Structures are given as structure tokens and as C-alpha cells.
């Protein structure tokens, strides 16, 4: 039923044709069940294991590698002679890499549990309904409830469907609907129509929502929505419809993969075409087909050379190490790619309650009357320190600590706070914190009594458990609570009837009252000044109310409670406690004692974190279910707004936002820093608008209501104390629920991206070198300098270790003074592309040069001419151009070993170059990252291993080198450091200043 909250009880019952006392007939139930289905959320069909595996092979680079492996396998099958076994090594290794990558990918996807499944934990098992087949209430499975059912709910129940209240069977009905609306305190419900068809869920005070909990009271209602039509069902549908966006890094790597695959294809075709003239060379036995296959193998080698096989593994390792560092800072990352996304966060949309604030209501101000003369009066105003439930804090007057027992008014105020109260403090030994037992507002008063210590109780030597309620216990020993007049909407107050534990002539029974100031003060005839009682004049009342109004607005927006007593109440037997309508009569002729102002205080460290965000170019937006006044006040306190800043067009309620045109809504999201009284749909809409500006949005949330927005935003951040749904829909969980942890995680994300950029560039320059090497050998007609199995070894192992170690580079000192990077910024810009192309060309030329040196100039080499080397395929005993040359020399393992050793050594030098993008090695020496030094040593050790330990040289088709050859390797390799230092010098002195200008 649409807009059931706007209809009267009679209209709703009439719509379903149901009587409140008898319920639906079984015939009606059957029809309604057929129409609306079961009252449960359908499970989402997940992807099958096969679908997940196939998905892992949708990446272009992976497909090229797969193709290369298949071709290598087919070619190896037709290989003859000694090389048959080694020919199978290459396709086997490629397949091994692909399988390992696929396993990691599938595991990660399976690990991101389904948030939609977690929603099911909010579905109650059973419900209590009235139906015509039985005279009394019956318990049935919640999934069998249908729209139109008459349901009974009582304290402790989980609401089984969306229900329009028809009657309340207790003085009040309080509902904890925080999981759905984010409201920090339980909500009092009523049965009157709410005439606004566009009311947000918080304002539908006559509705109960599926999955919420009854905190107090008992009521009846008619079911108006079940299953996916409930508010929680709508959240489920929204989550199903939300497609997970790929992270900026994933998009970059996708683009890079596409570009690389095109370049690889072109180069492979070019190499093959260049050598068409050599297809008939004698070495191929004059067979054109065998020649074509030989050059096809070289093209496959090129593909293997061009793809950085180690990149996925290195990225995963770097992100995993980043998550460990973040976990130490209380940020638990659930999705690895999001670690890097944090680095380009440009907007943080934060919940107020519990994230920016402590979610621990705390009294920060109070006043009692000091002096009254006619219509004029003066107040004693006090401030209270401490912003958590810990009973630690001081009471200050004029910024100086005071002893509360010196003020009679404060003694009475503390007595009311302690007795007119059903809450307590509890010390949680496991967590080492004080927690509330009961309502947040009442716990704030309990905590205030402990801080005031009006009877000067000796607190030293008490354990933390004993300390929790020590001062309250003293007051409760003096007077006994006989009964409570529960809170009701009409009088906006509650009271307790107390009698002294030691009756005497002077001590009489009293009623202590607390409630909304306007309601309580209207019923006060007197006012307490010290220990005396003075009539309340209109002037005094006006003065008191003006102070309360000032506290309730202004910079604090405190929640104020008036405290009063009834010194001569009726006796218990004279009161009718069955009818709550009479309670207001018993709470008249009151004496006003004082007022307390409380708020959910901002976390101490949040203001500095907001300032840090501003320096880092990150906009912080507060999004809350609370009212606008409170939200703006907290924004001012933590620095989201300046103290006197005009918040017009910067702060909106959900209603104000809805009333704007779509273009005005878009503009609002461009400037706004505060949204109050919002619903889940608003959060998702705000995220959509921000994404349309290419903002990278981090969204926090803890309730079921936050899940769609958490899933939609680039970075969903759930609270450690939040619901399972929020956690499973998010990328990150804050173990300490603290906003400052987000800022620390953003800083870590920026550092990780910078390091990632370094090692991606490092790996790519290595691949450019390998491609140039193979292209040069093919273009010059030289024998192969590097074969695929060697390239795989270099790409995976030798380069992989230093690349991983580059992930440990220390972050730049000014990392949080720069604006967020543009997610569209390419991994490799124009200048850097030139730089890595230049380095890559040197690597390729040096590798080919090392092989050529052994053929042409080495002492132990054949010393052939350049012509002979470049036409080696024409080498035959009867060819006069090759007189005196043993043709078998062109298959010697030495040139390959020289080429591989130069490639590995240059790559180690390159790793040192990658310590910093533009800083010289003199400014940033290798020991700045000791992991890098260790990984270079390990990589070189592994290279020696394949050179000198049998049977590895046979597999890699290489052979041990002597000292002269090693010296030549170093001479060819070391200039790469000088070359990169020159390029860095140009960047530092000529390019960076130009960019900054």
C-alpha cells in the first residue's frame, strides 16, 4: 500500500478489508500470498565457479599470453632433437602463471562475500498475528505474513514487515530504527496520520519498518508491505542494481593492456614481414614453410617479451603489503584494488554519528539559579569536560574547576539526574572502555552525576567496574524509586516517584521530573534558588527560556533537558497509573531546579583531520539523519564550516534537496558540505552526482540503509561497530569507527600509488628493452639473443623481486599537501614515455651489443665479421663468404648468456634509478629502501644460480661466464645509471619548474 503513513487507521484497515480484532480470513491470506509472495528477501544468484574462472581470462594481455602458450605448445610438439624437452618449458611456465593469476582472482571475488545475503540476518524468524481461524494471537513464520495481516509487537521483538500502527497498548512505543535511518536514539511512535506524502522515513512516526527493533512498549498494526516491497527490500533491490565500478588503477591497466596488445601485434607482424626474404635461407632446408614457422616463433618470443608477466603478482603483493600497514592504523581493507583508489579520493562523505562524533551523548553545559529578585535573575552556568561515557571530567565555572557539593542547586540537580533515570554505566573489560546500558540521553545524565560527585564520595582505590556507578549508588541509597510515570508525547516529560530510605519529619516523598524545557517550565510555579523556593515570575521564565533557546541554537545546538521536582505530590493510592492521559495532572505545580545541555560531541582528533583534508584538496561532506541545526553546529565545531560562515547553498536537508530541480541538485552537490535529515536514496543520489563531476568518493556508513551508497561509491567505508550488511557492501572497515583513520588510509593510498607508479614504469622499461632486443636481432639478421624461457625468468623472477621492493619506498614528506591526483592521469605521461623509451632502447641495444661483442670482438669468441653475423642463416660449408667459419658457432650459448647477464644487470641498475621519479641517487641513496638493496642481491644470486648450478644452464640454454666476460657485462650495463641521472636532471631543472609555473 502506497503512502500508508498519510492515511487514517480506518482507511488502512478498509483498504485491506480487515478487522483489527479478528484479522484476515484464511481465504484472504491465500489470495494475498499468491499476489505478493513470501515475506522474505530473495537470495541473489551468484556467479558459478566456471563463470568466475572464465572472467579471469577476459583481460587482453592474459589472452595474448594464452595464445602465445598455445602456439609455443604446438611448435614444441613438432620440435626435433635435443631441444624437445626445453621447448615444453616455455608454454608450461606461461600456463602456470595464468592459472596462478586466475586462482588469486577467483579467490578474491569469492572472498568479497555477498552483502545481499547479509541482509537476511535482519529478517525475523517469527511473527505474532491475529487471524480469523483462531481467537487469540498466534505465532507464525515471518515469511508467511502477508499485507493486511494484523500483527502484535512488543519490547524485544524484531519487526517482521513494514507495519502501519493501529493502536499502542502501552504508555509509549519506542523503536530502535538506527540500522535503517541512522538515528542515534530510539524513536517514539504514534498512530496519527502523517499528512505529508513525501515524508522521509524518520518522519513516518506511525510506521514500523521491517528489521528494526522494539525498544519499549507494545502495539498492534496492519502490515502494509512485505518482502522486497519493504524499505529494507528496496535497499536490497538498489544493491542488486548497483554494478561495481572498476577502480581507477584497474581502468588504467585495462587501457595499458589494450595499447600494449596493439603495439605487440604490430611489432610481431612487422618482424615476420621484415624476414619474409629469409624464409628460404639454407638453414631452414630451403623450405619456405619451415622458415615461416621459425620467424613465427620469434614473433611469439616478442609477445612474451613485451608482456610484463610479473606485473599482476607484483601489484597484488604491493597492495597486500599496503593493507597490512593500513590494518595497523585500524583500517581493514576488504578489496585489494581499493587500496590504490584511496589515494585519489577527492571527496569524503562522512556519517556524523559515531564517525565524526563519539556517539556517546555527553552533558557539556548546565545551569541553576543563583539569585532572583522580582523579574530579574542571574544564573550559575557551568561547563563539563570529557566527551565519552568514561566517568572522568571536571565541572568548571568561568573556566575554573568547582566543587559541586558547595552548590545546593547542583546537589538537587544531580539527585534528579540519578533517580529520574533507568540507565547505568558499564565497564567493558575486554575493550577497556565504559559503555552505556540503556538510553544514550539517560546515560549522559548518569555520567554527569559521576563527574559532579555532589556528596564528595571517596573514589580513589575503586576498580573501574566499581567506579562506573559509584556516585549514582550513593544517591540511590538515600531515596528509593517507587514507580515511574513513563514519557508520553503530549507532555514531553517523564517522572519518578521517590520516598526516602530513612523516613523522617523533614524528608518527604518527592516526584522528580525531566523533559523538554518548554513542556516542563510551563508546568513550573516555583524556582529553586539555593535551598529556597521562589515563585516563578514571567520575567524569570523568559530569561530562563532565552538561555535555553540560545543553547539549543547558535554554535552548539545542544539538546536541552529541564529538571524539576514536585515537593508535595499526591500519594500513590490517589493516582490512576493505568491511564497515561492523567500523568500530566500529577506533574503540575513543579519547582524548576535547573537545565542540562548535551550533545553527541565531536571526536577530539577530527578537527585536525578535517584540516589535513583541506590541505590535501579533499572536500569533507557530512551526511546525517539528524536535524540540520545539530549537523551545522557540529560542522562548525570540527572545521567543515567556519565559525561565522554563511551556510546558504552549502547545507541542505533531504527535503530541501528533493525540492530542487535536477540541475540545481547537481549544483548543490558541487558546493555542499552538509546534508541533514537524509534517507538512503539521498546518499546514493549524492554519490551519483559527485561521480558525474569525476570525483572519487569515499562514503562512510554503518547501517543497512547505507549499503547501496557504500556499494555505489568508489570507496565504501563501514564502521567496525556497524551492521554486517554495511561491512560486506564496503571496501574498507574502520576498526575504531574513527574519521581520522580514513585520512590516514588516504595518505597510505597516495604513497602506495606513487610506489606502484615507480615499479610499473620499472617493469615496462624492462619490457621495452626486451622488445627492442628481439626486434633488433630480427631486423639485423643476428642469431637469437634471448629466448622466451629466459624472458619469462627475467620478467617473473629477476625483475619481480626489485619491483616488489619498490613498494616499500618511503612516502614523500609533502604527500598530503598536494591535491588529489586526477584518476584520468595516465600512468606514463609524454616525458616519462620518452624517458622509458630512451632507457628501453639502451637496454635493447646493450643486450644485442653484448651478444654481438662475443661474436665479433671477444678473445674466446669466433671473431666473425659483421656481414657474417648478420647473414648467419646463409652459412654453409660451400659458401665462400663463410670460409673457415664453423656454422655451429652461431648456436653457441655464450652470446645468449652475455645478453641475459647484461639484461639482468641493467635491470638491477634500473631498479636503483626507480627509487625516486626525479631525485638523484646522490640525494636519495639506495639504503633509503633497504628492501630494494636486499632484493637486488637476491635477484643477482638467482641469476648466478641458473648460470652455475646444473641442470639449470641446460634448461635456460646458457653457460657460465669468466671474469673478462663479467667485466664486459658491467661496462655495458653501468652507463644506464648515468643516462637516467641526466634525464632526471633535465626533469628537475627544466620540466618540473615549467609545470609548476
UniProtKB/Swiss-Prot annotation:
Binding site for ATP: 353, 442, 489, 514, 559, 624-626, 677, 683, 705
Keyword Oxidoreductase: no
Region (Interaction with TMEM64 and PDIA3): 788-997
Tissue-by-tissue expression: Isoform 1 is expressed in the heart.
Binding-site positions, Ca(2+) 2: 767, 770, 798-799, 907
Domain notes: Ca(2+) and ATP binding cause major rearrangements of the cytoplasmic and transmembrane domains. According to the E1-E2 model, Ca(2+) binding to the cytosolic domain of the pump in the high-affinity E1 conformation is followed by the ATP-dependent phosphorylation of the active site Asp, giving rise to E1P. A conformational change of the phosphoenzyme gives rise to the low-affinity E2P state that exposes the Ca(2+) ions to the lumenal side and promotes Ca(2+) release. Dephosphorylation of the active site Asp mediates the subsequent return to the E1 conformation. PLN and SLN both have a single transmembrane helix; both occupy a similar binding site that is situated between the ATP2A2 transmembrane helices.
Residues engaged in binding Ca(2+) 1: 304-305, 307, 309, 795, 799
Pfam families: Cation_ATPase (PF13246), Cation_ATPase_C (PF00689), Cation_ATPase_N (PF00690), E1-E2_ATPase (PF00122), Hydrolase (PF00702)
UniProt protein name: Sarcoplasmic/endoplasmic reticulum calcium ATPase 2
Lumenal-side segments: 70-89, 274-295, 777-786, 851-896, 949-963
Family: Belongs to the cation transport ATPase (P-type) (TC 3.A.3) family. Type IIA subfamily.
Transmembrane feature ranges: 49-69, 90-110, 254-273, 296-313, 757-776, 787-807, 828-850, 897-916, 930-948, 964-984
Alphabetized CDD domains for the sequence: P-type_ATPase_SERCA (cd02083)
UniProt organism field: Canis lupus familiaris (Dog)
Modification sites for 3'-nitrotyrosine: 294-295
UniProt modified residues of type Phosphoserine: 38, 531, 580, 661, 663
Record-annotated disulphide pairs: 875-887
Location(s), subcellular: Endoplasmic reticulum membrane; Sarcoplasmic reticulum membrane
Reported modifications of this chain: Nitrated under oxidative stress. Nitration on the two tyrosine residues inhibits catalytic activity. Serotonylated on Gln residues by TGM2 in response to hypoxia, leading to its inactivation.
Amino acid at each position: 500500500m502506497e503512502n500508508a503513513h498519510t492515511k487514517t487507521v480506518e482507511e488502512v484497515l478498509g483498504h485491506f478489508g480487515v478487522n483489527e480484532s479478528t484479522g484476515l480470513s484464511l481465504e484472504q491470506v491465500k489470495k494475498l500470498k499468491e499476489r505478493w509472495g513470501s515475506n522474505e528477501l530473495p537470495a541473489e544468484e551468484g556467479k558459478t565457479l566456471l563463470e568466475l574462472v572464465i572472467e579471469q581470462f577476459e583481460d587482453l594481455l592474459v589472452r595474448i599470453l594464452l595464445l602465445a602458450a598455445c602456439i609455443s605448445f604446438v611448435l614444441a610438439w613438432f620440435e626435433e632433437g635435443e631441444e624437445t624437452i626445453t621447448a615444453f618449458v616455455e608454454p608450461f611456465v606461461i600456463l602456470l602463471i595464468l592459472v596462478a593469476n586466475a586462482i588469486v582472482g577467483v579467490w578474491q571475488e569469492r572472498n568479497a562475500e555477498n552483502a545481499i545475503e547479509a541482509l537476511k540476518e535482519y529478517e525475523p524468524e517469527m511473527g505474532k498475528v491475529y487471524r480469523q481461524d483462531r481467537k487469540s494471537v498466534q505465532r507464525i513464520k515471518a515469511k508467511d505474513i502477508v499485507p493486511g495481516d494484523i500483527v502484535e509487537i512488543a519490547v524485544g521483538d524484531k519487526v517482521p514487515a513494514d507495519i502501519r500502527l493501529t493502536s499502542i497498548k502501552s504508555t509509549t512505543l519506542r523503536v530502535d530504527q538506527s540500522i535503517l535511518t541512522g538515528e542515534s536514539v530510539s524513536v517514539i511512535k504514534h498512530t496519527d496520520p502523517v499528512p505529508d506524502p513525501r515524508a522521509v522515513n524518520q518522519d513516518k512516526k506511525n510506521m514500523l519498518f521491517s528489521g528494526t527493533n522494539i525498544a519499549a512498549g507494545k502495539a498492534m498494526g496492519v502490515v502494509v508491505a512485505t518482502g522486497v516491497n519493504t524499505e529494507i527490500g528496496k535497499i536490497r533491490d538498489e544493491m542488486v542494481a548497483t554494478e561495481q565500478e572498476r577502480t581507477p588503477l584497474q581502468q588504467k591497466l585495462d587501457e595499458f593492456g589494450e595499447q600494449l596488445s596493439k603495439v605487440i601485434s604490430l611489432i610481431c607482424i612487422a618482424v615476420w614481414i621484415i624476414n619474409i626474404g629469409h624464409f628460404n635461407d639454407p638453414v631452414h632446408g630451403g623450405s619456405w614453410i619451415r622458415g615461416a614457422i621459425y620467424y613465427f616463433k620469434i614473433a611469439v618470443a616478442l609477445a612474451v617479451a613485451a608482456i610484463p608477466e610479473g606485473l599482476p603478482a607484483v601489484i597484488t603483493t604491493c597492495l597486500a603489503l599496503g593493507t597490512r600497514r593500513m590494518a595497523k592504523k585500524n583500517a581493514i581493507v576488504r578489496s585489494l584494488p581499493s587500496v590504490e583508489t584511496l589515494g585519489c579520493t577527492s571527496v569524503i562523505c562522512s556519517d556524523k554519528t559515531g564517525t565524526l562524533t563519539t556517539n556517546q551523548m555527553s552533558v557539556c553545559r548546565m545551569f541553576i539559579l543563583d539569585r532572583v529578585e522580582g523579574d530579574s535573575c542571574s544564573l550559575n552556568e557551568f561547563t563539563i569536560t570529557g566527551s565519552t561515557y568514561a566517568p572522568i571530567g571536571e565541572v568548571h565555572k568561568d573556566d575554573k574547576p568547582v566543587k559541586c557539593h558547595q552548590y545546593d542547586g547542583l546537589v538537587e540537580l544531580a539527585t534528579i539526574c540519578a533517580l529520574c533515570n533507568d540507565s547505568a554505566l558499564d565497564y567493558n573489560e575486554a575493550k577497556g572502555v565504559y559503555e552505556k546500558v540503556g538510553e544514550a540521553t539517560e546515560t549522559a545524565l548518569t555520567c554527569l552525576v559521576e563527574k559532579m560527585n555532589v556528596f564528595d564520595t571517596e573514589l580513589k582505590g575503586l576498580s573501574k567496574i566499581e567506579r562506573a556507578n559509584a556516585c549514582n549508588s550513593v544517591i540511590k541509597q538515600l531515596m528509593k524509586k517507587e514507580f515511574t510515570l513513563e514519557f508520553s508525547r503530549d507532555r514531553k516529560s517523564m517522572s519518578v516517584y521517590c520516598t526516602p530510605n530513612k523516613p523522617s519529619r523533614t524528608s518527604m516523598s518527592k516526584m522528580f521530573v525531566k523533559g523538554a524545557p518548554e513542556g516542563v517550565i510551563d508546568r513550573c510555579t516555583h524556582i529553586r534558588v539555593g535551598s529556597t523556593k521562589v515563585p516563578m515570575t514571567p520575567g524569570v521564565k523568559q530569561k530562563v527560556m532565552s538561555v535555553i533557546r540560545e543553547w539549543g541554537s547558535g554554535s552548539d545546538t545542544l539538546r536541552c533537558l529541564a529538571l524539576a521536582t514536585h515537593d508535595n505530590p499526591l500519594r500513590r493510592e490517589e493516582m490512576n497509573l493505568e491511564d497515561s492521559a492523567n500523568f500530566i495532572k500529577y506533574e503540575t505545580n513543579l519547582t524548576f531546579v535547573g537545565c542540562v545541555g548535551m550533545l553527541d560531541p565531536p571526536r577530539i582528533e577530527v578537527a585536525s583531520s578535517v584540516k589535513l583534508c583541506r590541505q590535501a584538496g579533499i572536500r569533507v561532506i557530512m551526511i546525517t539523519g539528524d536535524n540540520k541545526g545539530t549537523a551545522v553546529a557540529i560542522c562548525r565545531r570540527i572545521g567543515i564550516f567556519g565559525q561565522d560562515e554563511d551556510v546558504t547553498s552549502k547545507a541542505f536537508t533531504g527535503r530541501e534537496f528533493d525540492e530542487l530541480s535536477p540541475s540545481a541538485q547537481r549544483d548543490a552537490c558541487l558546493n555542499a558540505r552538509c546534508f541533514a535529515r537524509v534517507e538512503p536514496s539521498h546518499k546514493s543520489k549524492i554519490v551519483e552526482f559527485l561521480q558525474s563531476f569525476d570525483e572519487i568518493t569515499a562514503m562512510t556508513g554503518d547501517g543497512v540503509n547505507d549499503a547501496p551508497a557504500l556499494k555505489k561509491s568508489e570507496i565504501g567505508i563501514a564502521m567496525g561497530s556497524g551492521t554486517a550488511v554495511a561491512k560486506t557492501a564496503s571496501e574498507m572497515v574502520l576498526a575504531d569507527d574513527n574519521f581520522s583513520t580514513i585520512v590516514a588510509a588516504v595518505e597510505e593510498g597516495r604513497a602506495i600509488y606513487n610506489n606502484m607508479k615507480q615499479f610499473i614504469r620499472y617493469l615496462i622499461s624492462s619490457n621495452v628493452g626486451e622488445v627492442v632486443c628481439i626486434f633488433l636481432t630480427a631486423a639485423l639478421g643476428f642469431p637469437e639473443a634471448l629466448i622466451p624461457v629466459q624472458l619469462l625468468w627475467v620478467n617473473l623472477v629477476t625483475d619481480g623481486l626489485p619491483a616488489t621492493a619498490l613498494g616499500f619506498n618511503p612516502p614523500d614528506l609533502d604527500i598530503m599537501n598536494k591535491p588529489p591526483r586526477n584518476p584520468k592521469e595516465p600512468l606514463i605521461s609524454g616525458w616519462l614515455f620518452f624517458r622509458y623509451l630512451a632507457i628501453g632502447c639502451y637496454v635493447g641495444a646493450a643486450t644485442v651489443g653484448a651478444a654481438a661483442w662475443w661474436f665479433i670482438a671477444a678473445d674466446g669468441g669466433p671473431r666473425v665479421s659483421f656481414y657474417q653475423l648478420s647473414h648467419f642463416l646463409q652459412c654453409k660449408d660451400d659458401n665462400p663468404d663463410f670460409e673457415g667459419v664453423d656454422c655451429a658457432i652461431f648456436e653457441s650459448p655464450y652470446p645468449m648468456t652475455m645478453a641475459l647477464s647484461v639484461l639482468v644487470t641493467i635491470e638491477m641498475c634500473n631498479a636503483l634509478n626507480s627509487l625516486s621519479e626525479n631525485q638523484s641517487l646522490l640525494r636519495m641513496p639506495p639504503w633509503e629502501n633497504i628492501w630494494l638493496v636486499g632484493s637486488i642481491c637476491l635477484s643477482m644470486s638467482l641469476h648466478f644460480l641458473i648460470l652455475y648450478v646444473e641442470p639449470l644452464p641446460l634448461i635456460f640454454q646458457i653457460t657460465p661466464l669468466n671474469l673478462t666476460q663479467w667485466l664486459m657485462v658491467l661496462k655495458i650495463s653501468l652507463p644506464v645509471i648515468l643516462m637516467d641521472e641526466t634525464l632526471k636532471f633535465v626533469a628537475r631543472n627544466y620540466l618540473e619548474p615549467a609545470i609548476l609555473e
